[in-house]
Amino acid sequence: MPDPASRRLLIQQGDADVARDLGADQIAALQGKPGVKVLSIPSAEQNYLAFNTGNDANPLLKNPALWEAARWLVDYDGITKDLLKGQYFVHQSFLPVGLPGALDNNPFKFDPAKAKAILAKAGIKDAHFTLDVENKPPFITIAQSMQASFAQGGVKIDLLPAAGSQVYARVRAKQHQAAIRLWIPDYFDAHSNASAFAYNDGKSSTVAGLNGWQIPELNKATLAAVAEPDAAKRLGLYKQMQEELQRSSPYVFVDQGKTQIVVRDNVKGYQQGLNADMVWYDRVSK
């Protein structure tokens, strides 16, 4: 059933046992209602801001001072708690919580004064960029919040909202200055994300490649980590890579999703992993 309002009605009336993909408003309306319970399960889905360092139309995009300032200009709590109503939580590294090796620290917070100081020290004035974004939640919601919060740090964002296919095409063609994007691992291993965000051999269309960012040391680190036979050492290498990208990279990792499922209170044994395909209905009973 495509309409989330209809799915909410079915689960509330007892005509369905499980309801998925409900909007934030539908979830909020069902919280605490008799006969149903809301499950919030971490998802591997992450939203991030990427600067296209290869776009020469705006030289500011390749300046690490802008990247650093941007990390302090996102209202992380306002986005996740107020605007997205708990359907996402703050997470600031490229491996999602739940994947082995993921950092769970969140070193950045909204601090426009700190961002202004970073920009001033770098001699950056009249900072501005265009931001490609899909014209639907949660992407446009995040982008509009950034437009307001970045302005408090003296950075002007011009939003370029469009259909998802158009944003995708512009990013693939490397025509964007910056973009709000979604990432989900292709498979359940740290290399899926590391090879996307840290690796750019100049040939493949990784996230790093699409944003013109190429660091030979990170290429070597990515290949070393995936080939490391010792599990503990391998996790340590991924933690080092995450710390390096937190320190300096053209990405601002904003949040991680929660898969919110509504089930009737007589449904037992529902389990779901990080990825959408990690659901085991054979364990469900009522």
What is each model feature region?
Residues 29-41, 48-63, 97-114, 120-124, ...:
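Short, solvent-exposed loop/beta-turn-alpha elements that line the ligand-binding surface or hinge
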Residues 39, 61-148, 152-153, 212-214, ...:
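Append "and occasionally in soluble cytosolic enzymes with long acidic Gly/Pro-rich linkers
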Residues 22-33, 185-190:
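A ligand-binding cleft/hinge motif common to bilobed small-molecule-binding domains
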